[in-house]
Amino acid sequence: MSKSDYIQNMFQTKSFVDRYKYTEKLTGLYAQTLVDYSGVANTSQKPLVVLDNACGIGAVSSVLNHTLQDEAKKTWKLTCGDLSEGMLETTKRRLQDEGWVNAETKIVNALDTGLPDGHYTHVFVAFGFQSFPDANAALKECFRILASGGILASSTWQNFNWIPIMKAAIETIPGNLPFPTQKEFIALHNAGWDSESYIQSELEKLGFRDVKVIPVPKETSIPIDEFFEVCMMIIPYLLPKFWTEEQRESHEKDVPMVLRQYLQDTYGANGQVPLEAVALITTGLKP
């Protein structure tokens, strides 16, 4: 299974989608930051035509709807696009529950969107470029569908501490079982998107101007039970890449118990897991 197959298969499964809400404690930390850095709330462009690309369960769209003035939302158009029907079902419920105005959900393949040329004033891609099967193709699509003067705003992970926490838990299992470091985990995804210079170069090569790539650190904490769910969303897709079949047969069934025990021993039975991350917030203008 290729890198892209592993990621794409993961996003399509029901168990992953069901648990994805817990990741918003992590990814959602940056939704407001991404919207703020895009300048969308202060732009003179009217009407706004916005694509939340690879929208997941709608964290960025939710922030947009809470941030923009009612006057702007009277004339704007928001499209929440994702390739996962399960994600879009959750986003659609959120759209209805929160009363988003002039918004729609749509199946969108970020690599080949089928959306019109030069159409959008803003395209948001929150933590998508590291997961796309072809990040360069997705970036070209963003450039193509943006109108002149349009803004691309994206977030990508530079570093975070949750993979090291999982690794420490797995290492309590006897047998010297392998588990990726943070660097090895990031290497499973598209290379370069954790580097300011790489991102700036890629956007400028394509024609973006006024490119800014800013590292933004954040800290939070979440209950053990929620962090456990995040781990169990990710670990089943990592073990086949790092464990032999024999190791999986012998130890995979023990992972949930071992993980929970490690978290309770480390942070207390009802404790909070401290999470730290740095994301790169990127903005670029299409001339």
Curated annotation (Swiss-Prot):
Its main location: cytoplasm. Disulfide bonds join 55-80. It is found in: Cytoplasm. GO terms for cellular component: cytoplasm. GO terms for molecular function: methyltransferase activity. Induction: Induced by exogenous gliotoxin. InterPro entries: SAM-dependent_MTases_sf. It catalyses: a thiol + S-adenosyl-L-methionine = a methyl thioether + S-adenosyl-L-homocysteine + H(+). The keyword Disulfide bond applies. GO terms for biological process: methylation. S-adenosyl-L-methionine binds at residues 27, 54, 82, 87, 109-110, 126, 248. Its EC number is 2.1.1.9. Keywords: Cytoplasm, Disulfide bond, Methyltransferase, S-adenosyl-L-methionine, Transferase. Pfam families: Ubie_methyltran. It is an enzyme of class 2 (transferase). PANTHER family: METHYLTRANSFERASE. S-methyltransferase that catalyzes the irreversible conversion of the secondary metabolite gliotoxin to bis(methylthio)gliotoxin (BmGT). Gliotoxin, a member of the epipolythiodioxopiperazine (ETP) class of toxins, is characterized by a disulfide bridged cyclic dipeptide. Its thiol groups are essential for bioactivity, as they conjugate to sulfur-containing proteins, disturb the intracellular redox equilibrium, and generate reactive oxygen species by cycling between reduced and oxidized states. Belongs to the class I-like SAM-binding methyltransferase superfamily. This is Gliotoxin thiomethyltransferase GtmA. It comes from Aspergillus fumigatus (strain ATCC MYA-4609 / CBS 101355 / FGSC A1100 / Af293).
